[in-house]
Each structure stands twice: as structure tokens, then as C-alpha cells.
């Protein structure tokens, strides 16, 4: 048994992506505690900020219905948050396992006998009790101008009931004294939000997330009220009010409901139905405010109500965790960070070829990490198929080698072209904002076209074609794009090849060549944005020989390696697409001995270099991937990171860092545009629409930003 100062660390209670919670014990008093241990090496700047926010907020929290932070300790490898121990687990576990618990724990059995339910949910009196306690905590947060932003059943923890009505009154508890005590936990996403303020961040759990957040609109503390409505509905009915496989379907389901909320064959009281419906209004302006909320008949009386009879506390050991009352084989581990909840964590074990993958979504279709690359069909570049026997880069598969040979052959042929046959460039190329013929200007042009519903004519390489007229929307500010800085927080970034892909020269090539050059630049920019994300993950799993204790655990390293591998495969797919198009154009024009610009050659050489390095790194990270079912897709990784970058950009914009936020906005647009490239295993129509919607939303912010700088 390990320990930290004043505490011993016992069995694991639950595990998430960034933290593990253990049952602990205070050495001097023997009191049980929960110890949330966070591995330092897994935290980037944003996660450190969230952890710091949680700690600072919890230090202020002294309320009977808020989980208390008892102590905070740091070691060279971990942060340890010593929390109040809630032995009955979380509300989600209780709802799902109440039948099994009633068979092994008399407390739960007597509770359900006293308050039987005709639905998969809970008896209405029990729901009211929990809602009273949740509302008391919410009112406390409101007084401190705090919005939780992640209210969900997994963050509502339960403790055994008070021993007496007097004890409940002395502790200032709400609800019925003889029933379990509910407490709000996990303030990692919480923030100070004055009543007049609006936030622009997307966080929390989608199934309980307000639609204004799903729509990536500004929101205020009313978002918490939606979450309370969703949680209350689940307690009453036994399932969330809206279910979906991804963000797209979830938002679509909410919007199509038109605020019509059904409760099934066993509806609760009219008051309860009205309460939930007042909260689950898709338009926040139609949703009740906090004044009306606290005045609603369901909430009005939150004080302790004595029903007189204590529940059966026999066999209840305050030191035992709820899971210990059920056979271990039947118990899944408590998941601490279900930000995507059930729809984003679905596992797909069905094996199918890409040709059958017509409805792949951003988050629900999960590929096996054991992949191989198959011969690309026209226009589809590298396609992925599932294969249990081998990893996709095993040496016996000659497809990748064949693609590498083809890429290098074309690049070598162009490299041998005499310099005198190429028009010279007046300057070296860099990926900049403001240049009317630049790739960034066309990114804004593409996004603006989506925003206005216009169609752009392109070379047919995918749905993300840019403007071919070279006009763009450049303001001439010349602010240099640093996607690496936006991704990694450094002052300057490096691409897969250590430099930016080239962008147009000041000389104007012939129309046909200009078209192919612009097409290649766009694909290169998309590939570069994905490669940068892969490179960040690549750097995270490099072993530190001098400090082996700082290396990530194998399971964590394998997971990150798997993500890097998927991203490098996506990068290779885009780069291969670029070379396919370049090769086709070169074949048609070289026979006429037409002169080509040096810029055409430069972008081919950059693409070749990026392809080779991405392939090499993919082979490296592949060695760290353990066998088993993958937990994500490249599409989801790219989608999530693009939204995270745009959210960070909004924060930078508020702080006045216009160059930094412009970089983040434009890079996120490129990443989302990369998702729209057509291939046989591409996005479904619904997913394409949601990606286009986010591109339009981010473009609005970018246009406003540039307007402010002019």
C-alpha cells in the first residue's frame, strides 16, 4: 500500500484519462478519504489550468451539498487532491445498478421498498429529494457567481443518510434527513461567470449539455439549468432526455423536438413535468431564469422534511465503497471523465471494409488499431481497412512502399528539371495571412463561401476547394501563421518537415498551373495542420532516458501512440492525394515540354519530405501500440482539437492576443476542412453538415477579428 503525507492510498475507485481516484485513509484518525491522483506528465497547459481552477474553487467550497477538498499535495510525478469520501458512489452508477444493489445492500433495498418506481427511474419523492439538494448547491454556486458547466449524474456523488433529523439540521442539509445525501463534485470546468457575462467555450458532457453550447454559441449560467433539467428527466424516466451517436445527431434531435418533452407511459406529476419542460427549452431565452427556478413549486421547499423512519443501515459499512457490495465481475470501473458520455465511448467491433462504411460519424465509429493500407482507388488516396492479424505498416505490405516510391519518383523527376526552365521566385515562401493569393486567404475564402452558401469552382480534389480567382480576402496585415505555436503553446511551430509548406510566389503562373498549385497548397496546409497535432502526440511518448520516472505508463503511452498513428495515417492520405493530383497534372503537361514554375517544384519537394517523415514517424509510434480495440478515430481527434483551438482563440481574443487567436482560428479551419476531403471511408452527410457549420461559426469570429484590426 502506497502513501502520501498523512494518508495511505488503497484500492482504486475509478479511472479517467487524466486522473485515478483511490480510496484512502487519514493515518491519524483512520477516516476514509478519496484521493484523486493526477499524473503531471499527462497535463498540458490547458489541463493544468483546469486543475488549478478546480483546486482554487474547491478551497472556497464549504457547503453540505458540495464535495469538500480536504487537502492538496504535490509530488515530483503527481498532484493529489484529498477529497471528502462519498461511499455510495455517483448518481449514474446508482441509477444503473439499483436493482443489483438492492439485492446486496439493505439500505438500498429498504429505500426502494419505501419508494418503489414503475419506471426505470426513481420514485418522484426521491427525485424531489435529490433535486432539492442539487438546487441548494446550485444556489450556493450562484451566490458566488460560479457556473459549474459539467452537471451530470457522474458528477453527483452520494453519501449515506444522516443518523438523525437533528444531525441533518445541524449539518444544514436539505431534503429528507433519512435519505442519501447528494453532493456536487468535479469543478474542473467551473468558472467565475457574472450574470451579464457570456462564455464561448465548449466543455462538459454532451448528453447533458445545453444546445447553445452544442451550437458553439455564447452561453451564460442558464446552461447549468438545462443540465439540471436533463439530469432530473433521467432520474424520473431512467434515461437521458435526448440520445444520439454524436454531436450532430444530438443537436438535431434536440432541435427537432421543438421543446416537446414526453415522459412515457408512467408520467410524473404535473408539477414535475412542468419543471423539466421549463428547463429543457432549446432557446435559452425561453428557458426559465434562476429566480423562476428557485420559485418553482418543485424547488420552493428545500428544508429538511422528517418522515420519521430511518432506512435499514444494517451491513452498511461507511468505509466500504458502493462497488464492494456487488460482485467484482459484474462491476465496471467508475469512469471519471465521460465528457463524451455513452455516445462518444461506443465500441465498434464489427469488421467491415471501407466500401461498406457509408455512415461513419465523427465519434461513434471506432476503428481497430490493427490496420493496413490498401491500394488507393482514384480520388480516394489511402484507404483504411480493419485487420486483426497485422498492423497497417508491417513490412510485408508493399502498398505503403509503393506509394513512397511513387511520391519519391515524381519528386526526383521534378528535382532533375533544369533551373533555367523554371520562372524564378522573388522571395521565399511562407504560410502567411493577408497575401491575396495565399493559402490562408483561400482558407478564409472557402470558409466564407460555406458561410454564405456559395459554391466554389475547384479542381475536384474534395469538398474543401478554395477560390481559384486569386482574389481572396486578405487584409494585408501579414500576421504569420504559427500552427505549431497554436497547437503546442510555443512561440514558433515546426511542421512535419521542420518548415512551412510553400505558398504562392509573387510571379503568376499560367492558369492551369496556378490552379494545380493552389490545389496542392490547400491540401498541403490541411496535411500540415494534422501532422502538427500528430507531432505533439509523438513528442509526448518519447522516452526520457535520463528521467525514466517521468515516462508515461505503458497503457497511457500506447493510447497516445495509437492516436498519433491514426493522425499520421490521415496526413499520409492527404499528402498522397496531393501527389496523385500533381502526378496527373505533370503527366498531361510534361509531354508538351511546358515550362513549370519553381514553386510547383518546391511544393512537390515539401510534400515528398512531409510524406517520408510522416511515414517514418507512423512506423515508430506503431511499435508502441498494444493490440486491442481502438478508442477513437482520426476524425474525432481532429474535430475535437479544432474546436479546442477555436475555443482557446476566443480566450486569446478577449485578452488582446490578436495574432495568436488569428493563428488558432485559421488552423482550426484547416483542420476541419481536412475532414471534408472525399474518400470512400469519409464522413456521412450529417457529419459533413456539422463540420461545415463549425467552419462557418469560426469564420464569423475570424471575420469579426480582422474587422477589429483594420
UniProtKB/Swiss-Prot annotation:
Residues 414-429 have a biased composition (Basic and acidic residues). Residues 459-477 have a biased composition (Gly residues). Residues 7-299 form the Protein kinase domain. One of its GO terms (cellular component) is cytoplasm. ATP binds at residues 13-21, 36. Its EC number is 2.7.11.1. InterPro entries: Atg1-like, ATG1-like_MIT2, Atg1-like_tMIT, Kinase-like_dom_sf, Prot_kinase_dom, Protein_kinase_ATP_BS, Ser/Thr_kinase_AS. Residues 340-380, 414-433, 454-514 are annotated as: Disordered. Serine/threonine protein kinase involved in the cytoplasm to vacuole transport (Cvt) and found to be essential in autophagy, where it is required for the formation of autophagosomes. Involved in the clearance of protein aggregates which cannot be efficiently cleared by the proteasome. Required for selective autophagic degradation of the nucleus (nucleophagy) as well as for mitophagy which contributes to regulate mitochondrial quantity and quality by eliminating the mitochondria to a basal level to fulfill cellular energy requirements and preventing excess ROS production. Belongs to the protein kinase superfamily. Ser/Thr protein kinase family. APG1/unc-51/ULK1 subfamily. This is Serine/threonine-protein kinase ATG1. It comes from Yarrowia lipolytica (strain CLIB 122 / E 150) (Yeast). The gene is ATG1.
Amino acid at each position: 500500500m502506497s502513501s502520501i503525507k498523512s494518508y495511505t492510498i488503497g484500492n482504486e475507485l475509478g479511472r479517467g484519462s487524466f486522473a485515478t481516484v483511490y480510496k484512502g485513509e487519514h493515518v491519524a484518525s483512520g477516516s476514509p478519504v478519496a484521493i484523486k491522483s493526477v499524473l503531471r506528465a499527462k497535463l498540458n497547459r490547458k489541463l493544468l489550468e483546469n486543475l488549478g481552477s478546480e483546486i482554487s474553487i474547491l478551497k472556497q467550497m464549504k457547503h453540505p451539498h458540495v464535495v469538500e477538498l480536504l487537502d492538496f499535495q504535490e509530488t515530483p510525478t503527481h498532484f493529489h487532491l484529498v477529497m471528502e469520501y462519498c461511499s455510495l458512489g455517483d448518481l449514474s452508477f446508482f441509477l444503473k445498478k439499483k436493482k443489483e444493489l438492492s439485492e446486496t445492500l439493505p439500505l438500498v433495498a429498504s429505500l426502494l421498498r419505501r419508494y418503489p418506481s414503475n419506471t426505470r427511474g426513481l420514485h418522484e419523492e426521491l427525485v424531489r429529494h435529490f433535486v432539492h439538494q442539487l438546487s441548494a448547491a446550485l444556489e450556493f454556486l450562484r451566490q458566488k457567481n460560479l457556473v459549474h458547466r459539467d452537471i451530470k449524474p457522474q458528477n453527483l456523488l452520494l453519501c449515506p443518510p444522516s443518523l438523525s433529523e437533528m444531525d441533518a439540521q445541524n449539518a444544514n442539509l436539505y431534503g429528507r434527513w433519512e435519505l442519501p445525501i447528494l453532493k456536487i463534485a468535479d469543478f474542473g470546468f467551473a468558472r467565475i461567470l457574472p450574470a451579464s457575462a457570456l462564455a464561448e467555450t465548449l466543455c462538459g458532457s454532451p448528453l447533458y449539455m445545453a444546445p447553445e453550447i452544442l451550437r458553439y454559441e455564447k452561453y451564460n449560467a442558464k446552461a447549468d439549468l438545462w443540465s439540471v433539467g436533463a439530469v432530473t428527466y433521467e432520474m424520473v424516466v431512467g434515461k437521458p432526455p435526448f440520445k444520439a451517436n454524436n454531436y450532430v445527431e444530438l443537436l438535431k434531435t434536440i432541435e427537432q423536438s421543438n421543446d416537446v418533452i414526453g415522459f412515457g407511459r408512467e408520467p410524473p406529476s404535473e408539477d414535475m413535468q412542468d419543471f423539466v419542460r421549463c428547463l429543457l427549452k432549446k432557446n435559452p431565452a425561453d428557458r426559465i431564469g434562476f429566480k423562476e427556478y428557485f420559485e418553482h413549486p418543485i424547488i420552493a421547499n428545500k428544508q429538511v422534511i422528517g418522515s420519521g423512519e430511518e432506512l435499514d443501515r444494517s451491513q452498511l459499512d461507511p468505509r466500504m465503497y458502493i462497488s464492494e457490495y456487488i460482485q467484482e465481475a459484474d462491476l465496471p470501473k467508475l469512469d471519471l471523465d465521460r465528457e463524451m458520455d455513452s455516445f462518444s465511448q461506443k465500441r465498434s467491433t464489427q469488421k467491415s471494409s471501407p466500401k461498406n462504411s457509408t455512415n461513419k460519424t465523427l465519434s461513434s465509429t471506432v476503428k481497430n488499431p490493427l490496420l493496413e493500407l490498401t491500394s488507393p482507388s482514384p480520388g480516394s488516396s489511402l484507404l483504411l481497412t480493419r485487420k486483426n492479424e497485422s498492423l497497417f505498416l508491417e513490412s510485408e505490405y508493399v502498398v505503403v512502399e509503393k506509394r513512397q516510391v511513387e511520391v519519391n519518383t515524381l519528386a526526383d523527376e521534378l528535382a532533375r528539371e533544369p533551373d533555367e526552365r523554371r520562372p524564378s521566385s522573388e522571395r521565399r515562401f511562407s504560410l502567411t495571412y493577408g497575401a491575396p493569393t495565399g493559402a490562408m486567404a483561400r482558407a478564409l475564402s472557402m470558409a466564407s463561401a460555406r458561410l454564405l452558401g456559395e459554391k466554389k469552382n475547384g479542381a475536384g480534389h474534395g469538398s474543401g476547394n478554395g477560390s481559384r480567382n486569386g482574389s481572396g480576402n486578405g487584409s494585408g496585415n501579414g500576421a504569420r501563421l504559427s500552427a505549431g505555436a497554436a497547437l503546442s503553446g510555443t512561440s514558433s511551430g515546426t511542421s512535419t518537415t521542420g518548415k512551412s509548406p510553400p505558398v504562392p510566389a509573387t510571379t503568376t503562373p499560367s492558369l492551369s498551373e496556378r490552379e494545380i498549385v493552389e490545389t496542392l497548397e490547400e491540401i498541403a496546409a490541411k496535411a500540415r495542420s494534422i501532422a502538427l497535432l500528430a507531432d505533439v502526440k509523438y513528442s509526448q511518448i518519447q522516452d526520457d532516458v535520463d528521467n525514466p520516472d517521468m515516462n508515461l505508463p505503458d497503457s497511457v503511452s500506447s493510447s497516445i501512440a495509437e492516436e498519433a498513428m491514426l493522425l499520421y495515417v490521415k496526413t499520409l492520405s492527404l499528402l498522397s492525394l496531393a501527389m496523385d493530383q500533381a502526378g496527373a497534372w505533370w503527366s498531361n503537361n510534361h509531354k508538351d515540354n511546358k515550362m513549370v514554375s519553381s514553386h510547383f517544384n518546391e511544393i512537390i519537394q515539401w510534400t515528398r519530405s512531409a510524406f517520408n517523415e510522416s511515414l517514418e514517424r507512423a512506423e515508430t509510434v506503431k511499435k508502441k501500440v498494444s493490440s486491442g480495440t481502438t478508442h477513437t478515430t482520426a476524425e474525432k481527434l481532429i474535430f475535437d482539437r479544432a474546436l479546442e483551438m477555436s475555443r482557446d482563440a476566443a480566450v486569446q481574443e478577449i485578452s488582446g492576443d490578436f495574432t495568436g487567436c488569428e493563428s488558432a482560428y485559421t488552423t482550426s479551419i484547416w483542420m476541419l476542412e481536412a475532414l471534408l476531403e472525399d474518400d470512400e471511408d469519409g464522413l456521412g452527410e450529417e457529419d459533413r453538415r456539422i463540420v461545415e457549420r463549425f467552419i462557418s461559426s469560426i469564420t464569423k469570429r475570424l471575420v469579426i477579428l480582422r474587422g477589429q484590426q483594420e
